[in-house]
Structure formats: structure tokens, C-alpha cells
Amino acid sequence: MKRIYLILIAAVAITFTSCSDRDMDTVKPDTGQGAPIINLPEGASQGKIMVKFKPEAASFLDAAVTRSIGGAMTRSGISDMDIILQRIGTHKLERIFPIDNRTEERTRKAGLNLWYVIHFDEDTNLEQVAKDLSQVADVAKVQFSHIIQRSYDPNVRATVLTKQAMSHVMRNTRAINVTPDDTYFNLQWGCKNDGSILQNEDKNDKGDKVVPAVTGVDVNCGEAWKLCTGDPSIIVAVLDEGVMYDHPDLKGNMWVNEAETFASKEDADGNGYAGDRYGYNFTDDKGYISYDDPNDTGHGTHVAGIISAVRNNGEGISGIAGGDKASNIGGVKIMSCQVFSGSKGCNLYQEAKAVKYAADNLSLIHISEPT
């Protein structure tokens, strides 16, 4: 547990201090004596800014959070801070990482309870807001919040093999001695590649010749499966587009928060996230995981399938750690932490929330985005 939380702290720190090389610069306050301002205002989200308070401000903030229960928090209880919050038209001041009594002690020990995001009038000059906030004595850091976009182009669709090429694939791999009986396992050259899957004469649906397979260029699943086919005690959080949680080849290996009702507006388990049965949609801040927006690419579901599509169930594909249904062995569990939705990306603070959510649930993390 201690090791996992140290990794979490490092991951969140990286999230809060990186977006691109351009954003690594720091804007210095005019006086040179204020809190550091991280990133640059160009391209940052308007009407949003992140602030980390100093530890001595915690009691004021805690009292403000308590007073705001049932409504939006708009003031901090710190006089100098509240003057600025009123001037910029603040309509919400929220703790980035919501209170969860099960993990709150660790959250405070890491200082993550001191991070807040301010939502204010979008017409207000963002750079000036940052400079003003940096002069508040109880502020330790100010950071512009940029949008994180996908590292893959949603307008580029994968080309598929022609029926003739697929027939060739199935015909030439049928004799391979493999365990899974999944319908399309023979097409998964990444799992087992004997060099016969694609030939020089094979073409895709656009008539282009495909690159022929190379023997042995795979992840050696055969040898790995002799040792382990999956372990349901392991949770993998997929930070990507939403995962199709009801897909017939995935639903058996989805992580399930039994205390919650999917997409409910009630936070039944008190972790700060309502309706998070299969994970959470951090882009839209709700428990409803979406995967069918016209601008979605299906990448989140694709990744989840590679990791843990139910193996040996007579349909679909074989997940690398999807277990073995025929032997009643479960696969690793997939948690959907949605950080992309249609054409939308998430803010830095939203991704930080996703990372912490995954860590609080003892998950391994897979992230698909720019490095």
C-alpha cells in the first residue's frame, strides 16, 4: 500500500507539472516574492485555474468545505483569497480530490487535500488572475489548467483486411496448436506469430498490400499462459475513451463497484463520485461511461480487450490476461477511467483525479496520451 501511494504522489505531481515542453516554463509574479505560477496561460482553459494552498490554510479550507455541504463552495474563509474570488466572479471553489474517509488520511499525508480548482467568469483575464492569486500569503502554487487531447487522430480509421485476405489468414493458421477457442484468436498475430498470417498478396479494404508477418514478432502469450492466464484480484484502470462495459467479451472481466448503481446521481459509497459502478467519466464528471459518441474511436474498448477480453469463451478475441473461462479462471478486472469523450479531452486536474481514483482502488494504470 505504501509503495502504491508513493507512486500515486509521483504520478499526480507529474500530471500537475507537465503538459508539453512549452508548458514547463514558469511565469514569475511581478514582485518576485509570490508563489510560483506553473505553465503558461496560452492555450489554458479559460475560467479555470488550480491552486495549492499552504498547510497552515487547511483548517480554514476544511471549515469552508463543511459550510458548503449541499451547495457550491465559493469562498475559502481566507480574507485575502476571498477578496480575489469575489472580484473574478467565482461560482465554484472545489477540492480537486474529493473527501473519501477510507483514504483521507493518506490524502492529507501527501498534501493532496490542499489542491483546489477555481471556476470563475471566463471573460476575466486569466494571466492576471494567476498573478493576483500568487500574491496571497496562504497560496503555495498557482497552475494554469490545459486540456489533454488524444495522442491518436480520431479522424483516422483503421483499415481492415478484405474477406479474401481474412480467409487466407484463417486457412493458414487453423493448424496452429493454441489453447483459446476464441473466434478471432487466429487473427491476433500479436499474441502468436508464426509468420504465415499475412502474405505479400494480401490487401486491406483500400487495395493496399499489407506488410507480411514476421515469425516470432509477438508478445509470447503461449509461454506466459503456461504460468498464468489472468488474476481477478488485479485491477487495471484504462485512462482513455470510455470502455464498452457491456461488451459480451468484456463484461465478465469488468471491475464492479457493488455499492454503486451505474450512472446514479447518488454517491452511495461516499467516495466523492456518484454512480461509479464500472469506473468514472472524469471528462464529464459523472458515473455514466460513454463509448458511442460519433467522434469516439473505440480506443478505450480496444485497449481493454487486448488486456482482458474473456479468453476461451468461444467468441471474440483473447485478452492477454483475460483468464480462462473453460477452466473457470477469471481475468484481470478492467476499470474505465474515462478521460476522453467524443472530441473532448480532459483538464489536467481531471486527469489527476483519475490517477488518484485508480490508485485509491489499488489499480494498475494504463494511459494513452501524448508523452
Locate predicted features:
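Catalytic-core regions of hydrolytic enzymes
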Residues: V339, S343-S363
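Bacterial signal peptide processing site
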Residues: S20-D23
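Protease zymogen maturation seam
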Residues: R102-V117, S134-I235, V243-D249, N253, ...
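Sec-dependent signal peptide recognition
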Residues: K2-I9
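Residue-level detector of conserved catalytic or cofactor/ligand-binding positions
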Residues: L362-T371
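C-terminal motif of bacterial Sec signal peptides marking the signal peptidase cleavage site
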Residues: T15-S18
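Inhibitory N-terminal propeptides of secreted protease zymogens
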Residues: T26-H168, N172
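Subtilisin-like serine protease catalytic core
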Residues: P212, D218, G222-L348
